[in-house]
A protein has these predicted regions:
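Acidic, Ser/Thr-rich low-complexity segments on the non-lumenal side of membrane proteins
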Residues: 103-137
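Cytosol-/stroma-facing membrane-proximal "stalk/adaptor" domains immediately downstream
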Residues: 145-178
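Membrane-cytosol interface motif
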Residues: 91-107
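Canonical alpha-helical transmembrane segments of integral membrane proteins
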Residues: 25-45
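Cytosolic juxtamembrane N-terminal segments of multi-pass membrane proteins
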Residues: 2-22
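Membrane-interfacial hairpin junctions
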Residues: 41-59
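Transmembrane alpha-helices and immediately adjacent membrane-cytoplasm interface residues
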Residues: 65-84
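Short, charged, amphipathic alpha-helical segments
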Residues: 118-125, 144-152
Length: 178
C-alpha cells in the first residue's frame, strides 16, 4: 500500500455480499482445481496402483496440484482486484494490511503522540477511524466500543494540544519515522 490512503464510506451490504462471494468463490476454485490438477498430474506422471498394493506415493503430485491451483487463485485475484465490482473488497483488504503495519509500530506511535507529535496523532486518528470502519463492516461489535473510547481519548489529547488533525492527511510514508 503506497501513496495516500483515504478513508472511504462503503456500502456495508454490498461489501459483505461481494466479500462472501469472493471468499466462497476462492475456496471452491481452490478445492475443485486442486482435485482436478492433482488427478491430472497423477494421470500423466503418477505411479499406477497395483491391485491390493499399498499407497502409490503420489502425494507430491497431489501437492503440486494444490500449489498450481493456488497459483491460479492468485492470478485471478491479481486480475480481478482492479474491477469495479471488487473495489470495496480490495480497498478493505488494503486497509487491513495498513492497519497491521501501524499496529506493529503502535507502541512507538503512541509514545510520540503523548509528546504531541503531529504525525503520530494523524496516524492514530487514521488508525482508530479505519478500525471503526472495518469493525462496522465486519460486524465486530465486541471491540468497536474500545476503538470508540480510544478515538475519544485521542480527540481529547488533540484538543488539549490545540492541534488540528485530519485522518485524510495520513500517508503510509509517515510510518517510516517510527
Amino acid at each position: 500500500v503506497s501513496g495516500v490512503m483515504k478513508l472511504v464510506n462503503i456500502n456495508k451490504s454490498q461489501y459483505r455480499s461481494v466479500n462472501n462471494q469472493v471468499q466462497i468463490g476462492l475456496v471452491a476454485t481452490l478445492a475443485i482445481l486442486s482435485v482436478i490438477l492433482g488427478q491430472l498430474m497423477i494421470y500423466f506422471f503418477g505411479v499406477k496402483p497395483l491391485p491390493g498394493a499399498e499407497a502409490t506415493g503420489n502425494f507430491h503430485l497431489n501437492f503440486t496440484g494444490v500449489i498450481l491451483a493456488l497459483m491460479v487463485c492468485v492470478f485471478l485475484i491479481r486480475n480481478l482486484r482492479s474491477k469495479p465490482k471488487f473495489y470495496e473488497v480490495y480497498y478493505v483488504w488494503q486497509l487491513k494490511q495498513l492497519q497491521n503495519k501501524i499496529y506493529r509500530k503502535l507502541k512507538s506511535i503512541q509514545l510520540a503522540a503523548k509528546d504531541n507529535n503531529r504525525d503520530a496523532l494523524v496516524i492514530l486518528s487514521f488508525y482508530y477511524q479505519s478500525l471503526a470502519l472495518v469493525y462496522e463492516l465486519d460486524n465486530n461489535t465486541l471491540t468497536i466500543s474500545n476503538v470508540n473510547n480510544e478515538l475519544d481519548k485521542l480527540q481529547k489529547c488533540i484538543d488539549a494540544a490545540g492541534i488540528s488533525v485530519d485522518a485524510d492527511e495520513f500517508t503510509p510514508d509517515m510510518l517510516q519515522a517510527f
